[in-house]
């Protein structure tokens, strides 16, 4: 076995694709296994910004979605070919955006083939060009180091038994698979070899054939009927399947079947559903075959958790678990006692033996009702509290939605705008939420924009540090191009009915604050953003449909998925009364102010801010900067790369471009040394009575980069009134960073590594590279305070 290539596709540091080459057993052929990073499959079917070229805007895709792929060189045709081809990666209901019921109803069409999801490990059976059968697991062949017998070995033994039962040979099967150019896909279920969640003993052991895939990059697979016929001809175990015509019929059946986790009186893990799709992320396929799965949540979620905590216990680690807390704690106590009495049980368990018998022994001794146990522990012990977390910008209607729900169900609304700003604000917000939980409320609305990624994850961290069992429900408001103008008009019509944004203090000020939020906004992206990955539920809302309809969406989602939280089904009159309360009766009484105490001398200007006048700006800026149009910066970058004969994807793909671009003129951290210059900026803003402080033009002189950050170095137009009144020795535009851990201000350190004489430059660091920008490129932006 040799490890070969590692390829990055979506700009991440870790490899998207890795390859390992194996010597095929009893053959002269080498087969290369291609393993794709699991998160990349999720990215590939998402609209994450990582899936789009930052310069051209074209969609970036994986070369194939195959999960389980082996290639080899065919000496006869003198070309590389796919020898083993697994399924395209498919997802559970609600696991990714394209497998929500709403999405499936739009991009899939029937008939829907349901196949029972057998509970084992996947085995691939294919043929080498020389007519030999090859059997593999998902990513390996033959003997695996550290194992006395591998999955592929056991799979091949079962294959021989199945073929013998119908008087067939491996050579005959190889000939048939070569003729079809297909891979047979089966589930190895054998408790004598390895236990999983469901039992497979006696005559139920063997290879369950559930797929025949064409050996090509696109996903082309045989129907369940063809697979069943093939299984019968070649002696495999058959997988039960049946059809449903509509998505609505399918959904009703699956939700009913999940109540007891059985089908035809047999406990099963769930179903795999096969259909056809026209989703845009699958456009590269010539086929439109599409799979998704419906795994019964109970009791198998609890069984999987028990398996994991048991292995932690045996390994000497402290068992960590988030659901079914009460019964899992009892199960761990039982296992601890059992293993102290029987050391062999530990050894067998780590070899995946005795898993089911240990679990069954605990259930019998505890005399527990299995389905009632798992459901009640999930809802009561696992997630006792529910927090609604909007992801929005100003004016989307989140407070109105919150107040409608408060009126309907008594769910308290914790408003960040009702809490003092300043240091420790996020923790105060979290503590206020926890206080409501401790006061006996099971649902709380976290009324804050949560528009920045780390705000969303920090909120979870701060709350879970103080209280267990919180279910986090994300409420992302759509942020389409027409939303900013729509919500801006809504805010202006609202007037002064807000704790901190008062239209009477100036329309320009309101627009400036809103623009700052737009620039900071990071879309909710559980597939591509680690800060968003741990939310339990997602309910998409839309500012354009109105707050009442958004409130109905939340209620309808809860009725379907968390019905115990909806004590009564509101009538139309109830909704109308709640809307009237939220819009007409509720009036914010708290006045949130920023900056210095307004009792100080009227219109006093200090290095901290401007106070006293209602039309001035009481909150001290973080910095003053020139805000630049994103498209202008990107087109300038394209121009520079074109002249240098460089391609972004080839030379700079490791960097992720910034969401917005600016040139920092002076930062609040520079006030102690440069207070006089800071006060000049404040005075200018005060005199103009607006945050729009005038346009400034710059010349882009160099493109500079190292392994962490890439930026433009710029110089200011000498005719500007601000020329010479900046505190950055090298003005610049940070273009991108190599990871989310790298901060944009590192451009300052990067430029310090170069020796500058006017526009002439000399590198003192071999890791720093640069391009001189010629001919001249001029870029212009608006000087504004940034809060």
Curated annotation (Swiss-Prot):
One of its GO terms (molecular function) is 2',3'-cyclic-nucleotide 3'-phosphodiesterase activity. It catalyses: ATP + (ribonucleotide)n-3'-hydroxyl + 5'-phospho-(ribonucleotide)m = (ribonucleotide)n+m + AMP + diphosphate. Required for the splicing of precursor tRNA molecules containing introns. The ligation activity requires three enzymatic activities: phosphorylation of the 5' terminus of the 3' half-tRNA in the presence of ATP, opening of the 2'3'-cyclic phosphodiester bond of the 5' half-tRNA leaving a 2'-phosphomonoester and ligation of the two tRNA halves in an ATP-dependent reaction. It is found in: Cytoplasm. Keywords: Cytoplasm, Ligase, tRNA processing. This is tRNA ligase 1. Its EC number is 6.5.1.3. Has three domain each corresponding to an enzymatic activity, namely in N- to C-terminal order: ligase, kinase and cyclic phosphodiesterase (CPDase). The active site is at 117 (n6-amp-lysine intermediate). GO terms for cellular component: cytosol; nucleus. It is an enzyme of class 6 (ligase). One of its GO terms (biological process) is tRNA splicing, via endonucleolytic cleavage and ligation. Belongs to the TRL1 family. Coiled coil: none annotated. SUPFAM superfamilies: P-loop containing nucleoside triphosphate hydrolases (SSF52540).
């Amino acid at each position: 076995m040799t490890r070969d290539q590692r390829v990055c596709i979506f700009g991440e540091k870790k490899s998207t694709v890795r390859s390992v080459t194996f010597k095929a057993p009893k053959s002269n052929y080498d087969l290369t296994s291609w393993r794709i990073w699991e998160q990349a499959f999720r990215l590939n079917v998402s609209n994450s910004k990582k899936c789009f070229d930052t310069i051209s805007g074209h969609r970036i895709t994986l070369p194939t979605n195959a999960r389980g792929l082996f290639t080899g060189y065919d000496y006869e045709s003198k070309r590389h070919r796919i020898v083993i081809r697994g399924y395209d990666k498919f997802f559970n209901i609600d696991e990714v955006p394209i497998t929500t019921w709403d999405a499936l109803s739009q991009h899939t069409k029937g008939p829907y083939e349901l196949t029972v999801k057998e509970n084992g490990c996947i085995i691939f059976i294919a043929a080498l060009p020389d007519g030999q059968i090859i059997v593999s697991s998902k990513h390996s062949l033959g003997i695996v180091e550290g194992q006395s017998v591998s999955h592929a070995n056991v799979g091949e033994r079962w294959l021989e038994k199945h073929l013998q039962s119908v008087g067939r040979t491996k050579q005959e099967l190889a000939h048939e698979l070569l003729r079809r150019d297909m891979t047979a896909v089966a589930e190895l279920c054998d408790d004598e070899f390895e236990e999983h969640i469901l039992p497979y003993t006696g005559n139920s052991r063997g290879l369950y054939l559930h797929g025949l895939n064409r050996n090509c990059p696109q996903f082309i697979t045989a129907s369940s009927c063809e697979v069943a016929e093939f299984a019968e001809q070649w002696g495999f175990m058959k997988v039960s399947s049946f059809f449903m015509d509509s998505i609505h019929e399918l959904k009703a059946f699956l939700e009913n079947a999940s109540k007891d986790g059985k089908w035809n009186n047999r406990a099963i893990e769930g179903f795999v559903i096969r259909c056809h799709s026209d989703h845009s992320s699958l456009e590269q396929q010539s086929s439109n075959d599409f799979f998704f799965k419906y795994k019964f949540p109970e009791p198998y979620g609890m069984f999987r958790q028990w398996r994991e905590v048991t292995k932690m216990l045996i390994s000497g680690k402290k068992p960590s678990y988030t659901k079914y807390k009460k019964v899992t704690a009892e199960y761990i106590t039982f296992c601890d006692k059992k293993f102290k009495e029987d050391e062999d049980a530990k050894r067998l368990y780590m070899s995946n033996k005795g898993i089911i018998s240990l679990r069954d022994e605990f259930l019998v001794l505890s005399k527990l009702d299995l389905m009632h146990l798992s459901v009640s522990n999930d809802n009561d012990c696992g997630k006792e509290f529910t927090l609604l977390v909007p992801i929005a910008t100003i004016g989307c209607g989140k407070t109105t939605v919150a107040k409608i729900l408060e009126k309907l169900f008594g769910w308290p609304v914790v408003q960040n705008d009702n809490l003092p700003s300043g240091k420790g604000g996020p923790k105060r917000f979290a503590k206020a939420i926890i206080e409501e939980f401790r006061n006996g409320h099971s649902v709380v609305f976290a009324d804050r924009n949560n528009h920045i990624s780390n705000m969303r994850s920090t909120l979870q961290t701060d709350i879970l540090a103080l209280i267990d069992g919180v279910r986090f429900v994300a409420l992302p408001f759509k942020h389409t191009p027409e939303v900013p103008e729509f919500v801006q008009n809504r805010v202006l019509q609202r007037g002064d009915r807000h704790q901190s944004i008062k239209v009477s203090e100036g329309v320009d000020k309101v627009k400036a604050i809103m623009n700052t939020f737009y620039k900071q906004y990071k879309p909710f992206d559980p597939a591509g953003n680690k800060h968003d990955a741990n939310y339990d539920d997602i309910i998409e809302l839309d500012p354009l449909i109105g707050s009442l309809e958004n409130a109905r969406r939340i209620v309808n989602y809860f009725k379907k998925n968390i019905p115990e939280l909806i004590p009564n089904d509101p009538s139309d009159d109830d909704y109308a009364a709640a809307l009237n309360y939220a819009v007409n009766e509720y009036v914010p009484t708290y006045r949130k102010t920023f900056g210095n105490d307004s009792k100080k001398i009227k219109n006093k200007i200090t290095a901290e801010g401007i106070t006293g006048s209602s039309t001035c700006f009481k909150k001290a800026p973080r910095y003053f900067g020139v805000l630049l149009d994103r498209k202008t910066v990107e087109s300038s970058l394209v121009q520079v790369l074109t002249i240098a004969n460089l391609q972004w994807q080839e030379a700079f793909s490791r960097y992720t471009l910034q969401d917005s671009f600016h040139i920092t003129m002076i930062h609040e951290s520079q006030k102690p040394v440069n207070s006089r210059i800071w006060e000049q900026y404040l005075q200018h803003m005060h005199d103009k009575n607006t945050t729009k402080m005038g346009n400034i033009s710059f010349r882009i002189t160099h493109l500079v980069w190292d392994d962490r950050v890439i930026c433009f170095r710029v110089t200011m137009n000498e005719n500007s009134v601000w020329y010479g009144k900046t505190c950055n020795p090298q003005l610049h535009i940070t273009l991108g960073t190599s990871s989310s851990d790298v901060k944009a201000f590192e451009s300052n350190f990067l430029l310090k590594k170069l020796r500058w004489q006017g526009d002439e430059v000399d590198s003192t660091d071999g890791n720093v590279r640069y391009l001189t920008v010629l001919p001249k490129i001029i870029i212009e932006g608006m000087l504004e305070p940034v809060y």
